[in-house]
Amino acid sequence: MKPKRQRKNSGYTMMELVVSLAILGTLVGTAMPIFSSMTEQTQADRNRANMNVIRETFFHYFYRTHMAGEPHFPITPDNNDSLMDTTWASTTIDSLMAPGVTPKSLFSDGEVPKNSNGNPFYYRTYNDTLATGEVRYFIILKDTDAESPSYQESFTHSI
């Protein structure tokens, strides 16, 4: 008589493995779009925060120049797209009032913030004189990078 082999019940059957993988695939399939939209939203929020950092920094510069009697924002970039590129960021803002002060030197890390793709923002400044004789100073910041989640979002601020 042959000895009976005992069956071991440790491990998974093929059916249990297939069902587990199907459940895992379903969970991953539903989580990926949620994760993607969260990532995109986070990048858009970061871009808005960077534009606000630029605005605040330029307003601080404006206040300093106002106290010195010559209120102004850093000049508009003279490149075709008015982008705050490295050439503009390294150019002296006002050689008479503050020699050696460049847009990038206004920031603690020595760099003008960029969008989440590493591309510069659009920047423009202008002033307008009201009928009362009051001069209003404006800055416009805009994300012109078509690949950015905050594409075409802009902020106009005045003082």
Where are the language model's segments positioned?
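N-terminal secretory signal peptides that target proteins for export/translocation
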Residues: 1-6
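N-terminal single-pass transmembrane signal-anchor helix
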Residues: 7-35
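Aliphatic-rich helix starts adjacent to a transmembrane/signal segment
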Residues: 21-25, 34-53
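Conserved alpha-helical elements of the SDR catalytic core
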Residues: 31, 38, 58
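Short, glycine/small-hydrophobic-rich surface segments
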Residues: 58-106
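Extended alpha-helical scaffolding regions
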Residues: 96, 105-112, 121, 133-135
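Short, surface-exposed interaction loops/tails
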Residues: 117-159
